[in-house]
């Protein structure tokens, strides 16, 4: 029997529903920091400078923040293929498997055009077309996120986007992580720019001498990237405003404590602002989860990050029944929802709001992060109430098609004119009458 261990801090645990709802609301507001106004001011300065000075401003900010001057801004195309060929075989195989599965799933997302004939022979429809250029932001520097490359580039390529551009910050040596370059090669990305931060978002939104102006920007980033995306929305499309990651685990007495602990830590290791929540009907699991977490935290390479996340944004809730668990989950609308219960399919049917649902003990969130197939770019901070995962449609737009004939216009003219006149739009009505006079 393993020795019982305890966390260096108490993991917040509540057993009252009203208190649980208040705690979950607190977690959804964790990005609302006092620093946000200061950061927004700095972001606005960066956006204005890049809009006015182009590459020169991008290079100045990169030199200031990242310690090198990106001249040229673009990574030479041959370096992407070189990076792919230089990968260890096991990593190359893993990326190919992920790429294949993600591609197969997203191919099924391609929307179909709609065509219908009205009562008088008029032709009506909706036509889908890809955007021309997509800009993908991939966090970088000391870390490598090839999964972010695949999860953004694959749907863009499946959509049929003509030009896919990645911006990813380089290290102080001026080099983008080779695994990111390799994934970009595999996914068919056209260009990689070795720039990051708000200046990269500005470059893609406004265009510079080196960076083409794009139609849609997708991909996660820090608060500078998120606020920059928010500021340029309307001039370009964006996927979403990503906040810190989160997981909510609903577990009953059948759940294994060590698996639950591992899944909570898998979220906590992302970021000190990441949120890990356990809602359970098992008092035994609730009482023992701290010990299971403490045991796995020993010698954890990201222990400080995990502890900060769990201390500030971790939560355990004990409920009387799974119906209450589902209701509390819906009030939180988690990015990731794991159902570690005896009948996960039945519980999933009760869930209304979640970015992604992982059913049963063999579906850890990690498989969704890397290669299950559905996209891992998901709404956070309760945005799952009104939005969903990044998809092929993120990189497409639809156009309405209307072709009336004389009979259709004859049959509907009086109603059109009546409605136009009721709104005081005389010329609208006249545009119909002139065709029939």
Swiss-Prot record:
Substrate binds at residues 245, 267, 270, 336, 369, 423, 428. It is an enzyme of class 1 (oxidoreductase). It holds the Pfam family Histidinol_dh. Its cofactor is Zn(2+). GO terms for cellular component: cytosol. GO terms for molecular function: histidinol dehydrogenase activity; NAD binding; zinc ion binding. The active site is at residues 335-336. This is Histidinol dehydrogenase. Gene3D superfamilies: 1.20.5.1300, Nitrogenase molybdenum iron protein domain. Pathway: Amino-acid biosynthesis; L-histidine biosynthesis; L-histidine from 5-phospho-alpha-D-ribose 1-diphosphate: step 9/9. Its EC number is 1.1.1.23. CDD domains: Histidinol_dh (cd06572). SUPFAM superfamilies: ALDH-like (SSF53720). It comes from Parasynechococcus marenigrum (strain WH8102). The lineage of its organism: Bacteria, Bacillati, Cyanobacteriota, Cyanophyceae, Synechococcales. Belongs to the histidinol dehydrogenase family.
């Amino acid at each position: 029997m393993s020795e019982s261990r305890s966390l260096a801090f108490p993991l917040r645990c509540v057993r009252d529903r009203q208190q649980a709802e208040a705690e979950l609301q607190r977690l959804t507001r964790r990005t609302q920091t006092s620093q946000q106004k200061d950061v927004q001011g700095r972001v606005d300065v960066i956006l204005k400078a890049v809009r006015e000075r182009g590459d020169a401003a991008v290079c100045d900010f990169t030199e200031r923040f990242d310690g090198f001057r990106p001249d040229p801004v673009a990574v030479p195309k041959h370096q992407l293929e070189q990076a792919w060929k230089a990968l260890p075989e096991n990593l190359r195989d893993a990326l190919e498997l992920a790429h294949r599965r993600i591609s197969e799933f997203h191919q099924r997302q391609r929307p179909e055009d709609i065509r219908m004939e009205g009562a008088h022979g008029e032709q009506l429809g909706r036509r889908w077309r890809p955007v021309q250029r997509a800009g993908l932001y991939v966090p970088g520097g000391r870390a490598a996120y090839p999964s972010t490359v695949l999860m953004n580039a694959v749907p863009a390529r499946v959509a049929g986007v003509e030009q896919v551009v990645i911006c990813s910050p380089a290290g102080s040596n001026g080099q983008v992580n080779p695994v990111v370059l390799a994934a970009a090669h595999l996914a068919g990305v056209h260009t990689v720019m070795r720039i990051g931060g708000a200046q990269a978002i500005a470059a893609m939104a406004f265009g510079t001498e080196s960076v083409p102006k794009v139609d849609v920007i997708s991909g996660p980033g820090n608060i500078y990237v998120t606020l920059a995306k928010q500021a340029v929305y309307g001039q370009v499309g964006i996927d979403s405003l990503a906040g810190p990651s989160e997981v909510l685990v609903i577990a009953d007495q059948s759940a294994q404590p060590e698996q639950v602990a591992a899944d909570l830590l898998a979220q906590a290791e992302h970021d000190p602002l990441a949120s890990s929540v356990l809602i359970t009907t098992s008092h035994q699991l609730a009482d023992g989860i701290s010990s299971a977490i403490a045991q796995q935290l020993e010698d954890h390479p990201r222990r400080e990050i995990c502890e900060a996340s769990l201390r500030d944004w971790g939560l355990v809730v004990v409920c009387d029944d799974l119906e209450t668990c589902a209701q509390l989950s819906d009030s939180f609308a988690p990015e990731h929802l794991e159902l570690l219960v005896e009948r996960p399919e039945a519980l999933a049917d009760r869930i209304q709001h979640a970015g992604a649902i992982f059913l049963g003990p063999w579906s850890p969130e990690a498989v969704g992060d890397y290669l299950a197939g559905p996209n891992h770019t998901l709404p956070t901070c309760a945005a799952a109430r009104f939005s969903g995962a990044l998809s092929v449609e993120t990189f497409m737009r639809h156009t309405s098609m209307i072709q009336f004939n004389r009979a259709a216009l004859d049959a509907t003219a009086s109603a059109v004119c009546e409605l136009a006149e009721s709104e005081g739009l005389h010329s609208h009505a006249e545009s119909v009458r002139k065709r029939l006079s």
